Curated annotation (Swiss-Prot):
It comes from Erythrobacter litoralis (strain HTCC2594). Homohexameric ring arranged as a trimer of dimers. The gene is rph. CDD domains: RNase_PH_bact (cd11362). GO terms for biological process: rRNA catabolic process; rRNA processing; tRNA processing. Signal peptide: none annotated. It catalyses: tRNA(n+1) + phosphate = tRNA(n) + a ribonucleoside 5'-diphosphate. Keywords: Nucleotidyltransferase, RNA-binding, rRNA processing, Transferase, tRNA processing, tRNA-binding. SUPFAM superfamilies: Ribonuclease PH domain 2-like, Ribosomal protein S5 domain 2-like. Phosphate binds at residues 86, 124-126. InterPro entries: ExoRNase_PH_dom1, ExoRNase_PH_dom2, ExoRNase_PH_dom2_sf, PNPase/RNase_PH_dom_sf, Ribosomal_Su5_D2-typ_SF, RNase_PH, RNase_PH_bac-type, RNase_PH_CS. Belongs to the RNase PH family. This is Ribonuclease PH.
Amino acid sequence: MRPSGRAPDEMRAITIETGYTKHAEGSCLIGFGDTKVLCTASVEERLPPWLRGKGQGWVTGEYSMLPRATHTRGNREAARGKQSGRTQEIQRLIGRSLRAVVDLEKLGERQITLDCDVIQADGGTRTASISGAWIALRLAVSGLMEQGQIKDDPITGKIAAISCGIYNGTPVLDLDYAEDSNADADANFVLIEGGKIAEAQATAEGATYDEEGLMRLLRLAQIGCAQIFKSQDEATK
């Protein structure tokens, strides 16, 4: 039995509120259960020096957590003077994931930064960030197209992410904090609509598992991402 009482293949409720901030070109507040992440897309008509003059744009991501997003207050990374390795890993993951579904040449010589700020954490913050960042990106790019700044849509498809794990010997979908902190194994999958895998991270925590165990987690991820794709459609139509 899962602590939440959910079935093994049952996700937490997905909530999405678009246009959450008025200044960003695209924004949403996404929730996977009690995990809440504010995702904003900022369009800048400039590029990193190493990309200038190459006829393409860039999509990158940043990630942070509010000090009291978790059970106990954590110090702001700015106060510590450096980002943690976890933060750097997650924001690189966000950038890689979004670039997997963007034609950078069609984007033109501009940069879009996806800022993912965790307001409340209850497991799955990186997966909610990626899923919400795509919505913010979609809204920002649609705005550029409506303004005539981009002719052809540079977004090639939808991308979403979800966590899975083995909890009390059972493969389960969309781990919350109680499950994640006690899971025998956990995995994060980033999937493109249509079946392609953009990223897979799998770790044995308390026990190892075989190939079939990994495939069972992947099948759960496919179930979860199908639900996220539907929610993304509804949020951006």
